[in-house]
């Protein structure tokens, strides 16, 4: 059993993201000797994946209680968080006890948020069971829940005590969810690691399979990109903003679809939008925009969204968490692995970029 440990620093308590097959046995060492109780937060649809986590921790001597929550984005609601706070209180959960989050990105976001807010902060260990969770949501310490006004508007920076990425959980993932996670892998390639793009382009079909020839390398490279960025900028005061490539429009699409649209699918469209913005601003050429479309489409990700949605999307973008005052900020590229911030783009520029994404712009690069 080969285990890879990717260190994440930038805090007084650095931690490892552990990657491998059949590695749930790493959990007791991460929980440690001081904890007596372990709360295992998991989607109510993933009891079979939470069960071995609970069994390993019980065997190690901990008082374990599972806390099922709704699946997906429905879990990231203040009512769900309040219910978990109540159950932690009923269990006399103390500051030395530990919360373990098992599931996809929405579940690990929620588990981290509850850990950050209970008793002003208890340790969290995250066990992502989706590709999206492994390469993005579980790494970096950003936690949050949604409101009616937008996604992740209430949250905290609360780095986990450890992240365990057991690759054995991926083969049972629905294909659409796995492909959605690839959007974040590809994003890491565009903002920091061109080798990721080369690997996907060399064999797109293999990239869509958990047992693909380069699957583990793609996952580890994407995690390493995020680990490096968040180690340098935990609280998103500077460099960490680049991780939001594609997310400004992507989050707006998710809200427009009432969070029923896969995160990765929305981010895929958002990256093409950001690339079109960069092209229109004179930063990149049409060939790089076309490369975005080609790579994303080659693994089954969408690159277009409906034309009539722009007014609602524009209004949502204005409350994006990256906005400074009244100034909109978009992560764009000056080149592959050369991210930058485009601040204050005009409404006309935004509309023109969106026309290209909706497929009706006369100057959109033809990649069909």
Curated annotation (Swiss-Prot):
- Gene Ontology annotations for the cellular component aspect, listed alphabetically: cytoplasm
Q: Where are the transmembrane segments?
A: none
Cofactor(s) required for function per UniProt: Co(2+); Zn(2+); NAD(+)
Q: Could you tell me the EC number(s) of this protein?
A: 4.2.3.4
Q: State the signal peptide span.
A: none
Residues at which NAD(+) binds: 71-76, 105-109, 129-130, 142, 151
Pfam families named in the record: DHQ_synthase, DHQS_C
Q: Where in the cell is it found?
A: Cytoplasm
Give me the reactions it catalyses: 7-phospho-2-dehydro-3-deoxy-D-arabino-heptonate = 3-dehydroquinate + phosphate
Query: Which GO molecular function, any one, fits this protein according to its record?
Result: metal ion binding
Enumerate the UniProt keywords alphabetically: Amino-acid biosynthesis, Aromatic amino acid biosynthesis, Cobalt, Cytoplasm, Lyase, Metal-binding, NAD, Nucleotide-binding, Zinc
**What does the entry comment about cofactor binding?**
Binds 1 divalent metal cation per subunit. Can use either Co(2+) or Zn(2+).
Q: A GO BP term, please?
A: chorismate biosynthetic process
Q: Gene3D superfamilies this protein is in?
A: 3.40.50.1970, Dehydroquinate synthase-like - alpha domain (1.20.1090.10)
The pathway is: Metabolic intermediate biosynthesis; chorismate biosynthesis; chorismate from D-erythrose 4-phosphate and phosphoenolpyruvate: step 2/7
Where, in this chain's numbering, is Zn(2+) bound? 184, 247, 263
Q: Which domain of life is it from?
A: Bacteria
Q: What does this protein do?
A: Catalyzes the conversion of 3-deoxy-D-arabino-heptulosonate 7-phosphate (DAHP) to dehydroquinate (DHQ).
Q: Which family does it belong to?
A: Belongs to the sugar phosphate cyclases superfamily. Dehydroquinate synthase family.
Protein name, please? 3-dehydroquinate synthase
Which species is listed as the source?
Thermobifida fusca (strain YX)
């Amino acid at each position: 059993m080969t285990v890879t440990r990717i260190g994440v620093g930038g805090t007084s308590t650095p931690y490892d993201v552990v990657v491998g097959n059949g590695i749930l046995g790493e959990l007791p060492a991460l929980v440690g000797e001081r904890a007596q109780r372990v709360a295992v937060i998991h989607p109510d649809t993933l009891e079979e994946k939470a069960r071995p986590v609970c069994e390993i921790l019980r065997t190690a001597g901990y008082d374990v209680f599972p806390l099922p929550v709704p699946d997906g984005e429905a879990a990231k609601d203040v009512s769900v968080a309040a219910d978990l706070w109540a159950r932690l209180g009923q269990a006399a959960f103390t500051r030395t006890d530990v919360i373990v989050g098992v599931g996809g990105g929405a579940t690990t976001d929620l588990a981290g948020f509850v850990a950050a807010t209970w008793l002003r902060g208890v340790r969290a260990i995250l066990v992502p069971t989706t590709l999206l969770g492994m390469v993005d949501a579980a790494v970096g310490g950003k936690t949050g829940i949604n409101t009616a006004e937008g996604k992740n508007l209430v949250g905290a920076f609360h780095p986990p005590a450890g992240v365990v990425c057991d690759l054995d959980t991926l083969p049972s993932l629905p294909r659409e969810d796995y492909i959605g996670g690839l959007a974040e892998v590809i994003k890491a390639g565009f903002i920091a690691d061109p080798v990721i793009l080369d690997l996907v382009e060399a064999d797109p079909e293999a990239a869509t399979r958990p047992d693909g020839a380069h699957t583990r390398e793609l996952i580890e490279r994407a995690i390493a990109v995020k680990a490096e960025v968040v180690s340098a900028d935990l609280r998103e005061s500077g460099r960490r903003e680049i991780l939001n490539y594609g997310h400004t429009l992507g989050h707006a699409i998710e809200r427009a679809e009432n969070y029923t649209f896969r995160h990765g699918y929305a981010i895929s469209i958002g990256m093409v939008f950001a690339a079109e913005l960069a092209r229109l601003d004179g930063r990149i050429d049409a060939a790089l925009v076309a490369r975005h479309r080609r790579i994303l489409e080659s693994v089954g990700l969408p690159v277009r969204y409906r034309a009539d949605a722009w007014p609602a999307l524009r209004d949502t973008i204005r409350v994006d968490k990256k906005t400074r005052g009244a100034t909109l900020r978009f992560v764009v590229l000056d080149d592959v692995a050369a991210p930058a911030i485009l601040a204050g783009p005009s409404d006309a520029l935004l509309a023109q970029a969106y026309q290209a994404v909706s497929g009706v712009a006369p100057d959109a690069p033809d990649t069909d």
